[in-house]
Amino acid sequence: MRVLAISGSLRSRSSNRALLDAAASLLPAGMTWQTYEGLTELPYFNPDDDEDGRPVPLAVADLRARVIAADGWVISSPEYAHGVPGSLKNALDWLVSCPELPGKPVLLLNASAAGGSFAQAALAETLRTMSLHLLEDSLTAPFLPRKLQEGGALEPGAARKLRDALEALAAAIRRRPPQ
């Protein structure tokens, strides 16, 4: 099963990226992982550029191909001003018209210092609007740097929770009817 991971943060030393990197080391058997690195390459969403028959920009076509090929997603997003970063929302706006998305399972992670509940709620609303299957096993890891050990591994309690969330994603992918 193929999973696409997306960090909503553009920071080079992002806690959300560190959380995705930690998750990549805890994958259930049979799960492969690809981290999307192209948020900065996406042009601003303009519905005029996404009309039937018009070719979308290359960066958008690449994102769509990766999302369509994935059996599930993991999104780790910070919280900025009680919301989702604009770069992540922009990427999701480009994906709204993809007919292959409804029902795909998505696991949400958040490593914001204060817990990120506002961003999680906003992101969940957007993903539900896109008809994605949002897992209840979403995970927040406030103050993540305190939970990271030497080499970027999570402390055992946090690692167990993240592994359980990834197992729930794997189960949701297995339950989804073939497309």
Regions found by a protein language model. Name each.
Residues 1-77, 81-93, 97, 153-179:
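N-terminal beta1-alpha1-beta2 submodule of the flavodoxin-like/Rossmannoid cofactor-binding fold
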Residues 104-143, 157:
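Short, glycine-/small-residue-rich phosphate/pyrophosphate-handling segment
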Residues 143-151:
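Internal, active-site/partner-interface "lid" segment
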